[in-house]
Curated annotation (Swiss-Prot):
Together with the chaperonin GroEL, plays an essential role in assisting protein folding. The GroEL-GroES system forms a nano-cage that allows encapsulation of the non-native substrate proteins and provides a physical environment optimized to promote and accelerate protein folding. GroES binds to the apical surface of the GroEL ring, thereby capping the opening of the GroEL channel. The keyword Transmembrane does not apply. Heptamer of 7 subunits arranged in a ring. Interacts with the chaperonin GroEL. Gene3D superfamilies: GroES chaperonin. Belongs to the GroES chaperonin family. Its main location: cytoplasm. This is Co-chaperonin GroES. Keywords: Chaperone, Cytoplasm. The gene is groES. Pfam families: Cpn10 (PF00166). NCBIfam families: PRK00364.1-2 (NF001527), PRK00364.1-6 (NF001530), PRK00364.2-2 (NF001531), PRK00364.2-4 (NF001533), PRK00364.2-5 (NF001534).
Amino acid sequence: MSVSIKPLEDRIVVRQLDAEQTTASGLVIPDSAKEKPQEGEVVAVGPGRVDDNGNRVPVDVAVGDVVLYSKYGGTEVKTGGEELLVLSARDVLAIVVK
């Protein structure tokens, strides 16, 4: 799917990955008790911020990366029937390597 959002500067667009639906013992977690997801797949990346010298500083993540991000970071947006999250690069905590 192509994303119709083009992030600016050091922002990235993330598709949130679903949180675990059941516990290790097999109990189903109701929607009201689920934690906000903190993992997602990068679907678009801005060109990077401009530093004090006018140089473009690229973002450390790329499209397709799975990232961990701050629990309450970013702005939720809906486009094309899909819910996405627009984050600043500083809200990304790590890239998940599998």
